[in-house]
């Protein structure tokens, strides 16, 4: 089943009409969803670099990734596009390319030797029909565990290595009763993010690629998948009653403030620790949990550029594409965002202990796992998200969930 962009995205009339731009003025309206403290500090790096290059950055931040995507895509389809829009690394811009709505960045990619300095999976995720249509700006690990070191020390716990270790510590924190064991954001996308971390860590790499990449319905009916489902549902025992609807960064702040012990979240969470003045390996720790055959779920962010008729807009787009990937910008952005540079040829000595761990994961090809957005189209991701949310929020059994996921995968063939 394929839901086309033009059917699934409502074309909403908008009052965001761009002001006329003179031929010698370089102006860029950028739609993104970076609105938390750490995210805002990171995107300012791009804005400042663009301003230094003589441009005017028009910040069109929209809270929530889905909201920002829908706003940007709707405007592009309606003929009133922004200069640049943020998307996740993966398949989210497929139909924009198919519709002839995006400009490729192949010339800039060749000029900057992107293929020589980025992981092959990232290049592939940005390439359509032999040309690059997206600027990958970072690599985010999606399945990190973050923990407050003082809180874990208070119950005599060391850094967990496996999901079994983590659950044992969560049991200790729950029995101690002083903090919330697991900080959680009860929103659909973060329910799915937690499930994904369990699936890769408990189910392993073959299950990850089998479910998301191959859409193998028989695998969803397996005992191994049901074990993943049971582990996932067990985690609900460790979250608080205030979790439903909570923002992810508010959950991160619970760990920062010592009100919660742990959080499963991508390394964008580290930007919140940084903004709060916390130091990796001193105030907080980080690890990726695996019961033996997991991996590092590697995603990130890209910017794409709608086709423009105005030469000054094209100039702004090319300038953005270049400056986002200069070594200086890459490091400055990573230090604020919590991600790691997408380029392998930058000096990473200034990165903290958690980022250094991330660099080691990415350097190990056996650990590199493409994100769900790289493996599956948005329709599949959305259908799985609905199933996961229903399982988390109801009394649905693991067997029922297994059957539901199998049906979703079958319908997406």
Can you say where each PLM-predicted feature lies in the sequence?
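Conserved N-terminal structural module of periplasmic/extracytoplasmic solute-binding proteins
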Residues: 21-99, 111-112, 159, 244, ...
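Extracytoplasmic/periplasmic substrate-recognition and gating elements
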Residues: 24, 48, 52-53, 78, ...
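Extracytoplasmic/periplasmic substrate-binding proteins
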Residues: 33, 92, 193, 230-313
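A structural signal for short loop-to-beta-strand junctions that line the ligand-binding cleft
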Residues: 74-75, 82-83, 114-147, 180-181, ...
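Hinge/lid segment of periplasmic solute-binding proteins
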Residues: 88-142, 167, 194, 281, ...
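Extracytoplasmic/periplasmic solute-binding protein
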Residues: 132-137, 167-217, 260
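Glycine-centered hinge/linker elements that transmit conformational signals in sensory
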Residues: 170-172, 213-244
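C-terminal capping/gating helix-and-loop segments adjacent to ligand/active sites or protein-protein/ligand interfaces
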Residues: 339-344, 356-413
